[in-house]
């Protein structure tokens, strides 16, 4: 009686083929998971930067002296100038896809260099003379990631001014 110990060549080829298919499937899912994680991190960075920008603007607009310019069309201009009681004249605008804050003649970029600003508009209402409405400014902000996997987000908030008088 003849006993065969070991595998035949065909069994070996079939097992290698099945193993290689499993490796390719596992590798593909791993690469997909990494791409998804990168996209999520880009989105998080864009969102955090947008929240920071809007919060900074909102804090200063909230306590500013009444903004005298009004616009009936919304979205309005992409530049907002106002008088802050402590910091003086402040202006927000977009320059080279970055948000620029001008205080006392000094320009400062307040957005992350990895985040591109696609839109910045201000809608001002309730500040006309004889108007009994609460003055408010709506900030509309569009941001996207500057990476190859561009993630875009649109943010909007409305800030009511605290008209503080002496």
PLM feature spans:
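Acidic surface patches and DE-rich sequence motifs
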Residues: 3, 84, 145
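Aliphatic-rich helix starts adjacent to a transmembrane/signal segment
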Residues: 3-55
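Alpha-helix exit/C-cap motif
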Residues: 36-37, 52-72
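Glycine-rich, flexible loop/turn motifs
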Residues: 39-42, 63, 106
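Type IV pilin-like appendage domain
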Residues: 68-130
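Short linear sequence signals and composition-biased patches located at protein termini or domain-edge surfaces
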Residues: 106-107, 111, 119-166
């Amino acid at each position: 009686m003849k006993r065969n110990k070991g595998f035949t060549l065909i069994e070996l080829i079939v097992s290698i083929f099945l193993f290689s298919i499993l490796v390719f499937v596992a590798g593909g899912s791993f690469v997909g998971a990494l791409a998804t994680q990168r996209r999520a991190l880009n989105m998080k960075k864009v969102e955090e930067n947008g929240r920071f920008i809007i919060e900074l603007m909102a804090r200063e607009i909230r306590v500013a002296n009444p903004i005298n310019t009004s616009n009936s069309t919304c979205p309005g201009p992409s530049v907002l100038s106002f008088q802050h009681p402590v910091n003086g004249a402040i202006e927000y605008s977009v320059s080279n896809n970055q948000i620029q804050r001008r205080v006392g003649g000094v320009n400062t970029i307040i957005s992350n260099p990895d985040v591109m600003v696609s839109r910045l508009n201000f809608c001002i209402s309730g500040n006309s003379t004889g108007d009994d409405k609460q003055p408010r400014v709506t900030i509309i902000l569009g941001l996207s990631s500057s990476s190859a996997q561009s993630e875009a987000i649109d943010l909007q908030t409305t800030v009511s001014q605290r008209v503080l008088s002496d």
